[in-house]
Amino acid sequence: DAANGAFIPVFKQMIQEFGGANVILCNTSLENGINHNCGVADLEGRHIVEANELSQEPLCHAEALIRILEEGRRKREQNSEGLTVGLVLDGDGDRCFMPVYDPQKDRIIIIDGDGLAILQLLWLKQNQKTREGQLYLNTVESSLEASRSALKAGCFVKQCAVGDKWILWDALLKAYKWKCNFFRNHINDPEFSRMLLNLENSFKNMEEQSSFD
């Protein structure tokens, strides 16, 4: 579910990389209105969607969930072992939920962004693509359970303020500090030292003012 928004072309490109999966792409028209009767908005705070809810407001317009229910039931009748899952974004693509069909109870389980992050983390760890002390960054609105799970997986958990710019800012600042220390230990030049000092002062001012130049 591209929420009739910014990720439409990205989703269309991703489909080519899904191998043998049967992919259904929906809500891909800007003319129908971004986030209108689609996307994650109506899924906020939900963990379970019962089948009968899809015939009532507001979820009766949720095309992605309806298609997941239909496909899940079809696979259940065929005794198929394949999973029926979805990816539901919001209009600008910075949030993603994963609805999963539960064939045992004929319902849809909603995995939110925090849950998805932990699933990705556990997959990376299982495939030895993480290291001890790996940074796990989330916001003050994130689930405490997600932070506990990340700590249990051996990550260093850091919280930041809400919003994309703060996550990017935190990543930028950490990268800058690492490079700064590296160059200090490898370059002995007065002019270069003055430049680093000016940069440090600029970063400090930006942090104090919560602004970006």
Predicted regions and their residues:
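Phosphate-binding chemistry for phosphorylated carbohydrates and sugar-nucleotides
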Residues: 2-213
